[in-house]
């Protein structure tokens, strides 16, 4: 039964990831006054299938100087972690209901650093290694901000459980009392998933794209799949933490539709930002985190800790 549930979770997530690539191209096309993919199938609907066939039927290339085991393991690890992150998400039922669901998400997402580091180091290419080091520095740096923001939401909900977090929002979304945290969370998720304007680790428009420069065919596709899976997962997590709809207001089917609509809107915002903003410089990226976001999130976290203590001394106003 667990295997069937696992397949029922993974298969729709993979299908959504495939068509997210098509949606991205279409949105980028229309924003640049062109049509995007429109040849393969009606209105280009079969383009993701054509891309998958092209990538997975190519001969896998292995650089002669690479460390074979780590080189092949890195993309597999990236996709495995991306799929593993979906297990505690309430949609409205989670595959595994962890009491420490938020901690599991935070710890597992941090493991993605290893796949990037392995890919850069095992390629034995200077360009790939430089890209991997920058990616690791960026991911770890923004992981700090994400952890502090999660701690602040825990103080409001009183539990690490994602289902309890939804119950907390019966009266109002956490977005309303913590909108500065929500804005910083959203920008940090852009950096965590290596999306524009923070796509310094994997510049698709550059000759040297980043840590995956030596990858081709199926192994490259696995990195690509992991990136888009993480985008959808991060937006689903944002929906759960800040704009969740309580279970008792909707039926299961309506809850799922509501949840996916919010996730889709956030994902479209990801793509819109890619179209609208140029890439940041690396020093600007680090300055934004260490000089702006980190002090602000720490100050807000202290605020959420101290306010209940201050208010506890006020007598009841009856």
From Swiss-Prot:
Subcellular location: Mitochondrion inner membrane
GO BP annotation list: aerobic respiration
InterPro entries assigned: NADH_UbQ_OxRdtase_su1/FPO, NADH_UbQ_OxRdtase_su1_CS
Pfam family membership, one: NADHdh
GO CC terms, sorted: mitochondrial inner membrane
Single GO term (MF): NADH dehydrogenase (ubiquinone) activity
Record's keyword terms, sorted: Electron transport, Membrane, Mitochondrion, Mitochondrion inner membrane, NAD, Respiratory chain, Translocase, Transmembrane, Transmembrane helix, Transport, Ubiquinone
Catalysed reactions listed for this entry: a ubiquinone + NADH + 5 H(+)(in) = a ubiquinol + NAD(+) + 4 H(+)(out)
Family as reported in the entry's similarity comment: Belongs to the complex I subunit 1 family.
Name this polypeptide is given: NADH-ubiquinone oxidoreductase chain 1
Organism, as annotated: Sapajus apella
């Amino acid at each position: 039964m667990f295997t069937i549930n696992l397949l029922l979770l993974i298969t729709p997530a993979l299908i959504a990831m495939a068509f997210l690539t098509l949606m991205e191209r279409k949105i980028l096309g229309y924003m640049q006054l062109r049509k995007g993919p429109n040849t393969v199938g009606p209105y280009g609907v079969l383009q993701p299938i054509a891309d998958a066939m092209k990538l997975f039927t190519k001969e896998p290339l292995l650089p002669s100087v690479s460390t074979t085991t780590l080189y092949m393991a890195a993309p597999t690890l990236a996709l495995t972690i991306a799929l593993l992150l979906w297990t505690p998400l309430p949609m409205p039922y989670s595959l595994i209901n962890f009491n420490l669901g938020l901690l599991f998400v935070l710890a597992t997402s941090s493991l993605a650093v290893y796949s990037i580091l392995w890919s850069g180091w095992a390629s034995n290419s200077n360009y790939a290694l430089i890209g991997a080091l920058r990616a690791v520095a960026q991911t770890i740096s923004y992981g700090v901000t994400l952890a502090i923001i999660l701690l602040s939401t825990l103080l409001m909900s009183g539990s690490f459980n994602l289902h309890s977090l939804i119950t907390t929002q019966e009266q109002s979304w956490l977005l309303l009392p913590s909108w500065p945290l929500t804005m910083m969370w959203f920008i940090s998720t852009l950096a965590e998933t290596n999306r524009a304007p923070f796509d310094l680790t994997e510049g698709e428009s550059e000759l040297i794209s980043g840590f995956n420069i030596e990858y081709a065919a199926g192994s490259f596709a696995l990195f690509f799949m992991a990136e888009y899976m993480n985008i959808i997962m991060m937006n689903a997590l944002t929906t759960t933490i800040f704009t969740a709809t309580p279970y008792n207001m909707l039926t299961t089917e309506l809850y799922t539709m509501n949840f996916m609509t919010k996730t889709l809107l956030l994902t479209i915002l990801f793509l819109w930002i890619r179209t609208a903003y140029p890439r940041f410089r690396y020093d600007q990226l680090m300055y934004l985190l260490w000089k702006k976001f980190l002090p602000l999130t720490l100050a807000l976290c202290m605020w959420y800790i101290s306010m209940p203590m201050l208010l506890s001394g006020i007598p009841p106003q009856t």
